[in-house]
Amino acid sequence: MTSSRPVAVIILAAGEGKRMRSTRPKVLHHIAGRSLLHHVLSAAGALAAARTAVVVGHGREQVAAMLAEQAPEVVPVVQDRQHGTGHAVRVALAALGELAPGDTVVVLPGDTPLLTSATLTALVAQHHARAAAATVLSAVIDDATGYGRVVRDGDGAVRAIVEHRDADAATATIREINTGVYAFAAGPLQTALARLTRDNAQGEEYLTDVVGLLVAAGQPVAARVVDDPGEAGGVNDRVQLAAAGRVLRDRIVEAAMRAGTTVVDPRTTWIDADVTLEPDTTIAPNTFLHGRTHVARGAVIGPECTLTDTTVGAGATVLRTTAERAEIGAGAVVGPYSHLRPGTRLGREGKIGSFVETKSADLGNQTKVPHLAYVGDAVVGERSNIGCTTVFVNYDGVAKHRTVIGSDVRIGSDTMLVAPVTVGDGAYTGAGSVIREDVPPGALAVREGRQRIIEGWVSRRRPGSPAARAAAAAGVQAPGSVGDPEHPDEMPQPSAAEAAVPIPAHQGDVAHRSELPHTGEGEAGIAGIPGAGSRT
């Protein structure tokens, strides 16, 4: 906003908010990814105030900490004793320093998250245009019970603000209410504040009394009726908190759609206030976008995604995924059922597939982790493939250690990479290997476990079982019993403990797996290495 008159903003946030029934100050409760106070500060930002003060009282340390982190330019002002809104403004003015009589002071409640920048800008513009000593933001509602009424004279000028408990029968019929939002000229405001008394039932200094004092002094007082009365609604309990959250959600989703985002089902889509969406993005149902998440053009998110402070590149697809503080490259594919923990970076056209968890993992362009894997504290180069059920073993019980995987590497299925360890460019690991030592570039690392075949074991040790019947149907003839002199190499008879173990109704077949790599590429085999391929 451009104005020839400097603007100062005072936000009243000292109340306890007892109806919230919370140890957290009311103004720090969140909707749409921001605290109530943060929403008010954001709306007031359009005024380009030279100085902004927030009056704090209950939970002052928590509120001051929030301001230091999110709005360090704002001055927190402590109201030690709750002597009313007039007293709070007087304390804030003293902290803001000297103001010229013609400067504008805007006063806002800290619990009105639905106020918009447009409304505040219009309020101040009217205040300046009419050269008013005070301009009240009012609202016209059907049921004004409990609200202070704005009383006007025959010319429409404001004569007074009358609290509900003090209203006579005629005043009680007025539907125009005071929202608690004001624009004042600094000089008349300071003069009126000095004349406030606490001669009332509450023993407090009311800011509403300033209006009456200004009128009595012959100063012009105006009112601007807000276009949407809902904007001025305060949040006093958790029911109202949820209601305000619904309004903000609808606003944000509608704005996103009008800016070029397809939201398939607005009713099941939640987008925080600080999320940014480029045009031609698609948000599928049951998706939650939190924090400072950014989604680039052409990306598809959802269904059933929760992304927090996550960046998604152009044309990426993210399905049924949870991600926190992660980066997903352009054209990448993530999900379903993936969990990208903080520090995950997936490069361009990469893949993180089903039931994969990553943490502090930098995965290069076109690198793939298709399914059932844990990748933590790792750097992986480009075009590498991490086979199914691979685990980056990063924790020794005391400290975390890093694994480094080069480019064009094939990690076989069920590999355990025990950090710290490095696998060089173009290297392979065999399926089922435990890699504890560095693997040179282009090498194959295999941890052998010799396979032993005992012919006829099922027929002798599991007679009558489905497996034995299947073996017989396949033409397998059982050799003699264990201990038969013709079969001295057979296993010995079971011990008493072994014999006591019940024989299961069905035993799965023993897979004859190659000890050479399963790369996860989905190929039938790699030239010269039979059985080296595996599913992806």
Curated annotation (Swiss-Prot):
<dbReference type="GO" id="GO:0005737">
    <property type="term" value="C:cytoplasm"/>
</dbReference>
<dbReference type="GO" id="GO:0016020">
    <property type="term" value="C:membrane"/>
</dbReference>
<protein>
    <recommendedName>
        <fullName>Bifunctional protein GlmU</fullName>
        <ecNumber>2.7.7.23</ecNumber>
        <ecNumber>2.3.1.157</ecNumber>
    </recommendedName>
</protein>
<feature type="binding site">
    <location>
        <position position="236"/>
    </location>
    <ligand>
        <name>Mg(2+)</name>
    </ligand>
</feature>
<feature type="binding site">
    <location>
        <position position="359"/>
    </location>
    <ligand>
        <name>UDP-N-acetyl-alpha-D-glucosamine</name>
    </ligand>
</feature>
<feature type="binding site">
    <location>
        <position position="413"/>
    </location>
    <ligand>
        <name>acetyl-CoA</name>
    </ligand>
</feature>
<feature type="compositionally biased region" description="Low complexity">
    <location>
        <begin position="464"/>
        <end position="483"/>
    </location>
</feature>
<feature type="binding site">
    <location>
        <position position="163"/>
    </location>
    <ligand>
        <name>UDP-N-acetyl-alpha-D-glucosamine</name>
    </ligand>
</feature>
<dbReference type="GO" id="GO:0000902">
    <property type="term" value="P:cell morphogenesis"/>
</dbReference>
<keyword id="KW-0511">Multifunctional enzyme</keyword>
<dbReference type="GO" id="GO:0000287">
    <property type="term" value="F:magnesium ion binding"/>
</dbReference>
<feature type="binding site">
    <location>
        <position position="341"/>
    </location>
    <ligand>
        <name>UDP-N-acetyl-alpha-D-glucosamine</name>
    </ligand>
</feature>
<feature type="region of interest" description="Pyrophosphorylase">
    <location>
        <begin position="1"/>
        <end position="238"/>
    </location>
</feature>
<keyword id="KW-0012">Acyltransferase</keyword>
<comment type="pathway">
    <text>Nucleotide-sugar biosynthesis; UDP-N-acetyl-alpha-D-glucosamine biosynthesis; UDP-N-acetyl-alpha-D-glucosamine from N-acetyl-alpha-D-glucosamine 1-phosphate: step 1/1.</text>
</comment>
<comment type="similarity">
    <text>In the C-terminal section; belongs to the transferase hexapeptide repeat family.</text>
</comment>
<dbReference type="GO" id="GO:0019134">
    <property type="term" value="F:glucosamine-1-phosphate N-acetyltransferase activity"/>
</dbReference>
<comment type="similarity">
    <text>In the N-terminal section; belongs to the N-acetylglucosamine-1-phosphate uridyltransferase family.</text>
</comment>
<feature type="region of interest" description="Linker">
    <location>
        <begin position="239"/>
        <end position="259"/>
    </location>
</feature>
<feature type="binding site">
    <location>
        <begin position="84"/>
        <end position="85"/>
    </location>
    <ligand>
        <name>UDP-N-acetyl-alpha-D-glucosamine</name>
    </ligand>
</feature>
<feature type="binding site">
    <location>
        <position position="79"/>
    </location>
    <ligand>
        <name>UDP-N-acetyl-alpha-D-glucosamine</name>
    </ligand>
</feature>
<keyword id="KW-0961">Cell wall biogenesis/degradation</keyword>
<feature type="binding site">
    <location>
        <position position="111"/>
    </location>
    <ligand>
        <name>Mg(2+)</name>
    </ligand>
</feature>
<keyword id="KW-0479">Metal-binding</keyword>
<dbReference type="GO" id="GO:0008360">
    <property type="term" value="P:regulation of cell shape"/>
</dbReference>
<dbReference type="InterPro" id="IPR005882">
    <property type="entry name" value="Bifunctional_GlmU"/>
</dbReference>
<keyword id="KW-0573">Peptidoglycan synthesis</keyword>
<dbReference type="Pfam" id="PF00132">
    <property type="entry name" value="Hexapep"/>
</dbReference>
<dbReference type="Pfam" id="PF00483">
    <property type="entry name" value="NTP_transferase"/>
</dbReference>
<dbReference type="GO" id="GO:0003977">
    <property type="term" value="F:UDP-N-acetylglucosamine diphosphorylase activity"/>
</dbReference>
<keyword id="KW-0677">Repeat</keyword>
<keyword id="KW-0133">Cell shape</keyword>
<feature type="binding site">
    <location>
        <position position="26"/>
    </location>
    <ligand>
        <name>UDP-N-acetyl-alpha-D-glucosamine</name>
    </ligand>
</feature>
<keyword id="KW-0548">Nucleotidyltransferase</keyword>
<dbReference type="GO" id="GO:0006048">
    <property type="term" value="P:UDP-N-acetylglucosamine biosynthetic process"/>
</dbReference>
<feature type="binding site">
    <location>
        <position position="374"/>
    </location>
    <ligand>
        <name>UDP-N-acetyl-alpha-D-glucosamine</name>
    </ligand>
</feature>
<comment type="function">
    <text>Catalyzes the last two sequential reactions in the de novo biosynthetic pathway for UDP-N-acetylglucosamine (UDP-GlcNAc). The C-terminal domain catalyzes the transfer of acetyl group from acetyl coenzyme A to glucosamine-1-phosphate (GlcN-1-P) to produce N-acetylglucosamine-1-phosphate (GlcNAc-1-P), which is converted into UDP-GlcNAc by the transfer of uridine 5-monophosphate (from uridine 5-triphosphate), a reaction catalyzed by the N-terminal domain.</text>
</comment>
<dbReference type="InterPro" id="IPR038009">
    <property type="entry name" value="GlmU_C_LbH"/>
</dbReference>
<feature type="active site" description="Proton acceptor">
    <location>
        <position position="371"/>
    </location>
</feature>
<feature type="binding site">
    <location>
        <position position="178"/>
    </location>
    <ligand>
        <name>UDP-N-acetyl-alpha-D-glucosamine</name>
    </ligand>
</feature>
<dbReference type="GO" id="GO:0071555">
    <property type="term" value="P:cell wall organization"/>
</dbReference>
<dbReference type="InterPro" id="IPR029044">
    <property type="entry name" value="Nucleotide-diphossugar_trans"/>
</dbReference>
